[in-house]
């Protein structure tokens, strides 16, 4: 018989072995939590992977996978699914999960274009409490919530984000910082107040001052940038210059000693081609001077209706107006200037150069490919044209090495180092209108357009620019012929300030509670259009005859106290406004090129005389004059961000693709007179 003491000792010795076996057996059935690496950003996957992991997990691990799936869905543009999954999150979350939930809520708000809602949520987050990868997302959300509007808060967010980024993202951050700085006016920059310890921000603001002082002198700009880099060697922008300033340092002026002018001289568009040629040659022979952009002109007397040339949709005419039957038949009178507030101008001129060799090529007589080959053989240093959109498309396909100032732009802009695009089109004017209306603080615009391809193009251009500026839905309403409008007036129907969305959005949200965020879908389009007079701006694209019916019809249906400001394109302004028309248009704002707004009276008189007082052709004449200025400053427009010419067709600047943006003059009918819009 074995002694009992021996049995007890043997059992005691076996116990640790048994316990260890049990422990290891338990570990063998437990799967490690893999969600941590994904939460911290050291590993990434798509939403399908996260959703699968979520279904196979439980408790905190399941919540982590759910949060990751929401983040991925937002990134993939699947906002509706993200909202649905977000609303399924449990109430009980740990601190880390709560912070992630709030950050996700802000990111969803941004995806739904609810920028105010996103800003409210971001204000509840303390960046120092976040993980490093969350901090980068937080600052990006702050940047996105600013909608690109330059401000001190946007600059601070960009500066805070920069150290958290990789090399590629750093360049994007630095470019965005410079974009914010260079988008400010000098007046905005002068109002900025910073703290004494914000050394990086101070450096950026000093670079901004260098740019303000020298942006129209590339040589001075180069020297200023080099000096700034020496004074601020530790600034991120000094170590990695903004791309636009790298281009400045590489600046080389283009030659205009031998110019090829490509225009249609036969067929339907010939009238425009020959008018542009007239303006270009006049500027070449007598030079150009900066134009006062904010001077209005009011007709001194009734002005006769002038026949307007009818053109194909592809022609770059800004105001293809039909004949109005509501204007007088007296001889045309010259506009009289009206005083206006002085504004700072970019003092850039293009001197006369009569000796420069200019050769005209008719794009209506032979294929563009043959013309371009001939231009190269002739040794042209710069090409101005072509004018028609289909010819510009052909130009891009040719991959010509020549510097080209195209007088139109294709449907899809291509960034070519040797091409700039200068268009006088209704779409270009609509984009300026979107910027002007947005600057006036309007939130809910309606576009009133003719039922035509022209109307569709204008509506799309306006909506695209509006949303690029951070705006939401744009509504459109179409009208028919003048006879249909007349019938509407006679029938007393009026025009309601409602419409259909130009670019409907599947989901935007209406609100979120503070303690338990819940994301909801957007109000319907009917709710948007009928929600207590939400429309606060109406942009009208109409001829003088059409707008003479449209404005009274809006008042007839909505009353004079509708709260919506009315705006119109230059299509409604053809130099035909008599005193009755001006009184009827009371309060209406409309856009016009500075030359015809009284900013350059000598040239206006010269242009109107050359085109028999046809305002549409006068605009094309001004385009020819500005084309000379742009050709003489081609390299500056192409390479120097912020370079500006106060031209006859607008204040001219170039975007990164070298599309020439035109800031137009805006005028207003007031007590029978035309004055600068306030």
Curated annotation (Swiss-Prot):
Transmembrane segments: none
Record lipid sites (N-palmitoyl cysteine): 27
Keyword terms, alphabetized: Cell outer membrane, Cell shape, Lipoprotein, Membrane, Palmitate, Peptidoglycan synthesis, Signal
Lipid-carrying residues in chain (S-diacylglycerol cysteine): 27
A single MF term (Gene Ontology): hydrolase activity, hydrolyzing O-glycosyl compounds
Compositional bias ranges of the Low complexity kind: 300-310, 330-340, 513-528
Pfam families in alphabetical order: LppC (PF04348)
Intracellular or extracellular location(s): Cell outer membrane
SUPFAM superfamilies: Bacterial muramidases, Periplasmic binding protein-like I
Membrane topology, from the record: Lipid-anchor
Renumbered residue ranges of the record's region Disordered: 300-340, 496-528
Gene3D superfamilies referenced in this protein's UniProt entry, alphabetically: 1.25.40.650, 3.40.50.2300, Tetratricopeptide repeat domain
One of the protein's GO biological processes: peptidoglycan biosynthetic process
InterPro entries: LpoA, Lytic_TGlycosylase_superhlx_U, Peripla_BP_I, TPR-like_helical_dom_sf
GO cellular component terms, semicolon-separated: periplasmic side of cell outer membrane; periplasmic space
Signal peptide (from-to): 1-26
Segments of skewed composition (Polar residues): 311-327
PANTHER family for the chain: PENICILLIN-BINDING PROTEIN ACTIVATOR LPOA
Subunit structure: Interacts with PBP1a.
Protein family per UniProt: Belongs to the LpoA family.
Functional description taken from the UniProt entry: Regulator of peptidoglycan synthesis that is essential for the function of penicillin-binding protein 1A (PBP1a).
Protein name: Penicillin-binding protein activator LpoA
Taxonomic lineage from the root: Bacteria, Pseudomonadati, Pseudomonadota, Gammaproteobacteria, Enterobacterales
């Amino acid at each position: 018989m074995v002694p009992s003491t021996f049995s007890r000792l043997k059992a005691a010795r076996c116990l640790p072995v048994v316990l260890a076996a049990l422990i290891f057996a338990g570990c063998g059935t437990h799967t490690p939590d893999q969600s941590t690496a994904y939460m911290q950003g050291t590993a990434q996957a798509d939403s399908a992977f996260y959703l699968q992991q979520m279904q196979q997990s439980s408790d905190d691990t399941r919540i982590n996978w759910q949060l990751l799936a929401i983040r991925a869905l937002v990134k993939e543009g699947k906002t509706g699914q993200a909202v649905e999954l977000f609303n399924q999150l449990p109430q009980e979350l740990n601190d880390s999960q709560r912070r992630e939930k709030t950050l996700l809520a802000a990111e969803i708000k941004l995806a739904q274009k609810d920028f105010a809602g996103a800003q409210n949520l971001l204000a509840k987050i303390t960046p120092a409490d976040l993980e490093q990868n969350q901090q980068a997302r937080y600052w990006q959300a702050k940047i996105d919530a600013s909608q690109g509007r330059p401000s001190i808060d946007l600059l601070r967010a960009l500066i805070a984000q920069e150290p958290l980024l990789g090399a590629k993202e750093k360049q994007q951050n630095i470019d965005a910082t410079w974009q914010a700085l260079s988008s400010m006016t000098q007046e905005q920059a002068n109002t900025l107040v910073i703290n004494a310890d914000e050394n990086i921000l101070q450096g950026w603001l000093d670079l901004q001052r260098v740019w303000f002082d020298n942006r129209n002198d590339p040589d001075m700009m180069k020297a200023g940038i080099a000096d700034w880099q020496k004074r601020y060697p530790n600034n991120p922008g000094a170590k990695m210059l903004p791309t636009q300033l790298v281009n400045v340092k590489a600046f080389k002026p283009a030659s205009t000693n031998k110019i090829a002018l490509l225009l249609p001289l036969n067929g339907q568009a010939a009238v425009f081609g020959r008018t542009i040629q007239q303006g270009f040659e006049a500027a070449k022979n007598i030079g150009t001077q900066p134009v006062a952009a904010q001077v209005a002109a009011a007709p001194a007397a009734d002005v006769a209706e002038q026949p307007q040339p009818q053109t194909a949709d592809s022609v770059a005419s800004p105001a293809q107006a039909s004949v109005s039957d509501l204007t007088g038949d007296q001889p045309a009178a010259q506009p009289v200037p009206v005083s206006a507030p002085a504004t700072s101008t970019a003092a850039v001129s293009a001197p006369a150069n009569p000796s420069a060799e200019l050769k005209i090529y008719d794009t209506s007589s032979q294929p563009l490919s043959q013309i371009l080959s001939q231009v190269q053989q002739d040794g042209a240093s710069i090409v101005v044209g072509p004018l028609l959109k289909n010819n510009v498309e052909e130009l891009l396909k040719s991959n010509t090495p020549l510097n080209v100032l195209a007088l139109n732009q294709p449907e899809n802009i291509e960034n070519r180092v040797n091409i700039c695009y200068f268009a006088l089109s209704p779409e270009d004017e609509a984009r300026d209108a979107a910027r002007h209306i947005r600057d006036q603080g309007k939130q809910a615009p309606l576009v009133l357009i003719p039922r035509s391809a022209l109307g569709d193009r204008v509506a799309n251009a306006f909506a695209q620019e509006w949303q690029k500026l951070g705006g939401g839905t744009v509504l459109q309403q179409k009208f028919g012929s003048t006879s249909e409008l007349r019938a509407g007036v006679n029938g007393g129907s009026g025009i309601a300030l409602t419409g259909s969305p130009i670019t409907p959005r599947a989901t935007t949200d209406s609100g979120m509670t503070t303690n338990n965020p819940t994301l909801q879908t957007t109000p319907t389009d009917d709710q948007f259009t009928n929600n207590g007079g939400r429309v606060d701006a109406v942009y009208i694209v109409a001829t003088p005859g059409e707008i003479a019916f449209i404005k009274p019809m809006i008042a007839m249906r909505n009353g004079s106290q509708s709260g919506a400001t009315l705006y119109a394109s230059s299509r409604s302004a053809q130099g035909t406004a008599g005193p009755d028309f001006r009184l009827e248009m009371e309060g209406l704002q409309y856009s016009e090129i500075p030359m015809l707004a009284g900013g350059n009276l000598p040239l206006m008189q010269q242009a109107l005389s050359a085109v028999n007082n046809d305002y549409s052709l006068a605009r094309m004449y001004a385009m020819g004059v500005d084309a000379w200025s742009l050709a003489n400053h081609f390299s500056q427009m192409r390479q120097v961000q912020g370079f500006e010419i106060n031209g006859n067709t607008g204040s001219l600047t170039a975007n990164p693709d070298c599309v020439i943006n035109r800031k137009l003059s805006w005028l207003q009918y007031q007590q029978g007179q035309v004055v600068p819009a306030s």
